[in-house]
């Protein structure tokens, strides 16, 4: 339970009483993040009536899993992320701060993927050979190697070898795959292997086999109730794969009505997550399906498809990103050693002061020098000392039930749609669901309260900016000194500059410039940290434009658009498009391209159901259409 002092709405001071959380027959009182992610895992497993064997089969023994679920062991990030996805949870919920060996391995994976993504097969092969020697001694790394060899074979036109390798890779974690008729739980990674196999089986003329795989995955998507972040990666591709078979005349057209419901569900998942994965082939099929099932929506689908086709072509994006692999987009892992050292410097602590009596100064020195990885226990202990209690296993928040994470996602959407009453209700629920003894959660709830009071008129922009500034553990002008900030800290910084922008105060632009330096010129990093990058570049390009720096605003807006299209995302896309058009309006030279950009912004706003932005863009288009005439 969380109580506030009587003047909470003005001073935002917390009085904490550890809340009691009931789950099954277990009561917990906890002031650390230890165990939260495994409680979340257990809660979801039991809620979905999955057995231990269901989720650990092929990836670990029941004994290891039971120890993990009871908080008695620390396992590899590969295992934990796979387990999370198998119970339908977005894997980022278990944290992004990795040990040294895991960080290096995932960095090497990303380099291989970049080689394949860019079509540089020779470079990818060489990197894969090195990776296999260094890491190929566990089932997850060996599976990755086999999967990459399958993709290389496919790129070289050897479909026969590719399908054999895809099957071998899948059976590394799903050994009974050939006999599976119903999928109870599956990781995104495993689902993509099945989709790749289905696609190749269809290409080889094995229609019944391909249809069976697609049907299995469609049934899973329909009934699993997994998080939308996972479904956005799987559902659209599975729908398009099955419709390829039906459209070719290899299956019954009576399936169209049922497939239209699947297509609607897939489109809904993309809309909810602001993703564009497989949006074009999905919409092409929906235009056909709607002829018999939903003619009233034809115009909507036509407009969205035409806009996406035109805009993707304009950006040179002529392929489907998720064609073959759940690419490492928005999986920007951080090295926990770096986080610890940056925070030590931030607080002005010597190595000896931070080590204290809990670990040796010599060992801490080796951690800082990246000679060794700290254990999970040591990392948690050091971060607790540094004011980051809860950060090790955090996304934005740390919670033991998936509802809290969904509420946070919904909170942001409320402000887009201006549904402040719902946002207030979400805040109340979050206060009941989160343990504010964890600094990460305390900071998040303070931010939510400030944002609500600002839009409800209880505090003005100047007061809000001051309160946001006070939430940070460092001066705002020092924000650019640190490369690793928690997600909630970045969110607070961006909202601080948003307040200054609304107040037309630009004296602190140098601090904003320094903060944005980490996003400058590192295209791969921006893709890997897409969710934070897209928010940062949206606020910064708007800020620069409003400050009269139109050229720099255009540069950042265009870079943001490039990353959004490359990653097939659309959360700030309409704002970035309008930013460029608005800059040119201020210059007095609105072009046809600006009108195209604003029309695309309108289409995206309509797709998301944002009627306020639709009306705003429509008015701008109407005004400048007349001038173009």
Which residue stretches match the model-derived regions?
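DNA major-groove recognition helix of helix-turn-helix/homeodomain DNA-binding modules
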Residues: 76-93, 375-393, 627
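"A position-specific structural signal for the A-helix of alpha-solenoid helical repeats
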Residues: 110, 144-151, 189, 195-196, ...
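Residue register of alpha-helical TPR repeats
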Residues: 106, 144, 185, 192, ...
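Short alpha-helical DNA-recognition segment
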Residues: 48-67, 346-365
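Flexible helix-coil transition and linker loops at the boundaries of alpha-helical arrays
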Residues: 96-97, 131-142, 172-187, 220-233, ...
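Helix-turn-helix repeat elements of alpha-solenoid scaffolds
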Residues: 115-130, 156-177, 204-223, 251-265, ...
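A short, Lys/Arg-rich alpha-helix, primarily the initiator
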Residues: 8, 14-47, 318-347
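Short C-terminal boundary/hinge segments that cap the last helix of small helical domains
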Residues: 88-104, 387-404
């Amino acid at each position: 339970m969380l109580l506030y002092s009587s003047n909470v709405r003005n001073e935002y001071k917390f009085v904490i009483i550890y809340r009691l959380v009931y789950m099954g027959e277990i009561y917990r009182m906890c002031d650390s993040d230890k165990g939260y992610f495994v409680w979340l895992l257990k809660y979801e497993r039991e809620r979905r009536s999955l057995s231990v064997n269901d989720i650990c089969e092929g990836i670990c023994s029941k004994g290891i899993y039971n120890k993990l679920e009871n908080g008695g062991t620390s396992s590899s990030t590969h295992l934990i992320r796979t387990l999370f996805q198998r119970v339908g949870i977005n894997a980022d919920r278990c944290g992004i701060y990795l040990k040294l060996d895991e960080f290096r391995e995932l960095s090497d994976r990303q380099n291989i993927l970049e080689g394949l993504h860019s079509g540089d097969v020779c470079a990818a092969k060489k990197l894969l050979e090195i990776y296999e020697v260094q890491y190929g001694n566990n089932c997850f790394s060996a599976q990755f190697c086999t999967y990459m060899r399958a993709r290389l074979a496919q790129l070289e036109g050897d479909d026969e070898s590719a399908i054999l390798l895809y099957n071998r890779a899948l059976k590394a974690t799903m050994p009974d795959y050939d006999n599976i008729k119903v999928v109870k739980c599956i990781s995104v990674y495993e689902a993509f292997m099945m989709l790749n196999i289905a696609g190749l089986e269809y290409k080889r003329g094995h229609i019944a086999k391909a249809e069976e795989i697609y049907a299995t995955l469609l049934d899973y998507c329909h009934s699993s109730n997994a998080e939308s972040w996972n479904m956005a990666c799987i559902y659209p591709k599975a729908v398009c794969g099955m419709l390829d078979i039906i459209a070719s005349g290899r299956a019954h057209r009576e399936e169209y009505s049922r497939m239209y419901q699947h297509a609607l569900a897939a489109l809904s998942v993309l809309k909810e997550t602001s993703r564009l994965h497989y949006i074009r082939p999905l919409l092409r099929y929906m235009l056909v399906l709607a002829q018999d099932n939903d003619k009233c929506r034809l115009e909507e689908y036509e407009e969205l498809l035409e806009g996406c086709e035109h805009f993707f072509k304009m950006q040179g994006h002529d392929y489907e990103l998720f064609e073959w692999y759940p690419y490492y987009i928005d999986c920007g892992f951080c090295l926990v050693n770096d986080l610890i050292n940056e925070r030590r410097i931030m607080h002005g602590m010597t190595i000896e002061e931070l080590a204290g009596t809990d670990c040796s100064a010599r060992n801490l020195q080796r951690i800082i020098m990246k000679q060794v990885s700290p254990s999970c226990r040591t990392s948690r202990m050091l971060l607790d000392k540094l004011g980051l209690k809860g950060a090790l296993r955090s996304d934005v928040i740390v919670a033991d039930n998936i509802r809290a994470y969904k509420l946070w996602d919904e909170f942001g959407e409320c402000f887009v749609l201006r549904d402040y009453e719902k946002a207030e209700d979400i805040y109340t629920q979050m206060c009941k669901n989160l343990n504010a003894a964890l600094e990460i959660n305390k900071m998040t709830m303070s931010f939510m309260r400030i944002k609500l009071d600002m839009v409800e008129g209880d505090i003005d922009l100047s007061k809000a900016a001051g309160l946001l500034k006070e939430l940070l553990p460092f001066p705002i002008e020092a924000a650019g000194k640190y490369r690793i900030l928690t997600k909630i800290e970045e969110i607070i910084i961006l909202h601080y500059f948003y307040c200054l922008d609304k107040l037309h105060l630009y004296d602190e632009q140098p601090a904003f410039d320094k903060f944005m330096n980490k996003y400058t010129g590192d295209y791969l990093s921006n893709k890997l940290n897409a969710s934070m990058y897209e928010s940062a570049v949206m606020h910064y390009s708007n800020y620069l434009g409003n400050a009269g720096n139109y050229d720099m605003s255009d540069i950042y807006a265009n870079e943001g658009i490039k990353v959004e299209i490359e990653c097939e995302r659309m959360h700030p896309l309409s704002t970035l498009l309008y930013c460029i058009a608005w800059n040119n309006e201020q210059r007095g030279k609105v072009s046809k391209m600006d009108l195209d950009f604003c029309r695309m912004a309108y289409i995206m706003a309509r797709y998301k159901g944002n009627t306020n932005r639709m009306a705003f863009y429509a008015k701008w288009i109407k005004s400048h259409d007349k001038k173009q005439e």
